[in-house]
């Protein structure tokens, strides 16, 4: 993942350096003077869940007996997804813009559980898997600071907040996430003025606990409880590469 990020940043930097060697004719010279404009966005993202495991805990089984469990849960890889949306951008002054970008984020998370209280035939903890489908509807609010335009490119940095609503969830899953989350976004990108193409790489970190603790009380199959109680909190993380077209 780090290698992928560094490669993307290197390509963007090299492209800017090459195009900045000499002055050229500017395409769409007045496009940044518009007070407001619309656009569309498509992209890919990589998502992860950062769990805090509960450790040794107890639960009541189907027969009413109290039992102990010690199960760990982890999303042991960054899972890819895709993003589609629209945007509206307001020009504040020659360097600052304010962007509102409603979007949909689709993906799948792969969770791995290890039951430390139960062993398989060769002495390893029993392993269970969960495939968690995710579909988020979001509306990002971003403040953009752009450098002075040079030729047909203009690098910028951005930051903002992105509230999301989780549209997915299955009552047969071990782990379930809350219906709403709030993300902090920080990133960088560059405007290209062939037809106002804007690639942007940003990092998103969940500011709220996304783990639905109330789901424990709704589990009907009591044999799932050791796995449902494996985590006490979870925070979502994403790395998003998005292309804006205006």
Provide a role label for each language-model segment.
Residues 34-36, 78-82, 133-139, 153, ...:
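Residues that define the transmembrane beta-barrel architecture of outer-membrane proteins
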Residues 1-25, 243-246:
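Bacterial Sec-dependent N-terminal signal peptides
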Residues 50-75, 108-134, 167-177, 211-231:
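Flexible, solvent-exposed loop segments that connect beta-strands
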Residues 33, 91-95, 148-152, 193-195, ...:
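Outer-membrane beta-barrel channels and translocator barrels
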Residues 40-44, 82-90, 102-104, 137-147, ...:
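Residues on the lipid-exposed face of transmembrane beta-strands in outer-membrane beta-barrel proteins
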Residues 21-81, 236-246:
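Short glycine/proline- and aromatic-enriched beta-strand/turn motifs that initiate or cap beta-hairpins
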Residues 179, 189-246:
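Predominantly the C-terminal beta-signal and adjacent terminal strand-loop region
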Residues 97, 106-109, 146-154, 162-167, ...:
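Acidic/histidine-enriched, beta-strand-rich ligand/metal-binding domains
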